Amino acid sequence: MKHRVKHIHFVGIGGVGMCGIAEVLHGLGYTVSGSDMADGATTKRLAAEGVRVFFGHDATYVEGADVVVTSTAVKADNPEVLAARDKRIPVIPRALMLAELMRFKQGIAIAGTHGKTTTTSLTASVLGAAGLDPTFVIGGKLTAAGTNAKLGLGEFLVAEADESDASFLHLTPVMAVVTNIDADHMDTYDHSFDKLKQAFVDFLQRMPFYGRAVLCVDDPNVREIRERVTKPVTTYGLDDSADIYAENVRAAAGQMHFDVVVKNGAITRFPLVLNLPGRHNVLNALSAIAIGLECGASIEAIQKGLSEFAGVGRRFQRYGEVKAQDGGSFTLIDDYGHHPVEMAATLAAVRGAFPDRRLLLAFQPHRYTRTRDLFEDFVKVLSGVDALLLSEVYAAGEAPIVAADGRALARAVRVGGKVEPLFVEDIADMPQAILDAARDGDVVVTMGAGSVGAVPGKVTALAG
């Protein structure tokens, strides 16, 4: 690519999926520029590194670019996209640029409906502890690195593979993980679950003949597609039929302790402490262990990488103790969960880490279509908390859908009779609503994929 492409321009450079790729390309010596609607921590960091960042969108911003990279959030009538097409400058999706990056390295792609960001982060941590200095592009900020992307000197590149728009079918990794397959983003697959599952098969089949698929056999849908995958496969799970499995799993002080069993001709066993709560994170760690072993990491490096894992932004991110208005304090945690399956897993992890504590959930639904398609599943998981604050749906560009909004969810939960929800229409009012509702000793979880991510910081600021 480098002999023809010198200047790469990103439309929407501040997006979590775009900034990491831009950062790595800048580190490789390309001229990188980009535009975004607003200034923020990400655009400030890119500008400080020497990336030229424009605000707003204008046709002149693509001057001199050899290629323009867009995300799915960028519309076809964006003035920069129109100008690029008029000038015959190639316009490509971010996944195609990620695929080009993988040509520089040995690509490791992490796919699945849930757990991609955490699993990618755990894998990067394991490879880093092994001295393999991986390049990584992650959908959240890796706490230890202070960023969501890094250009390493090693041969491996670890990145998330996004099924939401089927763009993972652009990638050609040498190793690929599938954590699970659930019904989400079904518009992309004509509302056919069979098409969604086949897309994961097609993704795995894009690996070379020497590639390796790492599959979670605890997930029934992953188990089902396994027979369609002709590449070498390593399985993992809590089930002892897997090639790599965990036994003696127990929670302690916000961590998970377990023994790892590896079937590799002989049986290898070793103890492990994962610095994350939840059985779902044990599964995520097992896939990172499988990748680590495949890449030559020692058991000691794997143990170090997982026991010292410092977390990733908005994935069970702890904000510590916050002053409660009734005296004492409550524990504040923030999480990106926005699908009922991942919400249930996170809330189960909270219950395990903080037994016998009242659980207050402040949830912002994400997308009207998801709320409509999974309405009863949302009602079920929301009804399992002790106290509930519910905001209006974060639209993410969608038009409202009747009976698939925040008020409808609140009514349905109320009818169930297990918890009395408080509807907070404007997310800007959520920080004060949390302080009004939280009691001494509570565990408060803010959750969702939209603007709720700004709420915990405002809660701590208001509490003083």
UniProtKB/Swiss-Prot annotation:
Keywords assigned: ATP-binding, Cell cycle, Cell division, Cell shape, Cell wall biogenesis/degradation, Cytoplasm, Ligase, Nucleotide-binding, Peptidoglycan synthesis
Binding residues for ATP: 112-118
Any one GO molecular function term: ATP binding
Biological-process GO terms, alphabetical: cell division; cell wall organization; peptidoglycan biosynthetic process; regulation of cell shape
The protein's enzyme class: ligase
Known pathway: Cell wall biogenesis; peptidoglycan biosynthesis
Cell membrane is among the record's keywords: no
One GO location term (cellular component): cytoplasm
Reaction catalysed by this enzyme: UDP-N-acetyl-alpha-D-muramate + L-alanine + ATP = UDP-N-acetyl-alpha-D-muramoyl-L-alanine + ADP + phosphate + H(+)
Enzyme Commission no: 6.3.2.8
Localization of this protein: Cytoplasm
Protein task: Cell wall formation.
PANTHER family reported in the protein's UniProt record: UDP-N-ACETYLMURAMATE--L-ALANINE LIGASE, UDP-N-ACETYLMURAMATE--L-ALANINE LIGASE-RELATED
HAMAP family given in the database record: MurC (MF_00046)
Entry similarity comment: Belongs to the MurCDEF family.
Name of the protein: UDP-N-acetylmuramate--L-alanine ligase
Organism: Chromobacterium violaceum (strain ATCC 12472 / DSM 30191 / JCM 1249 / CCUG 213 / NBRC 12614 / NCIMB 9131 / NCTC 9757 / MK)
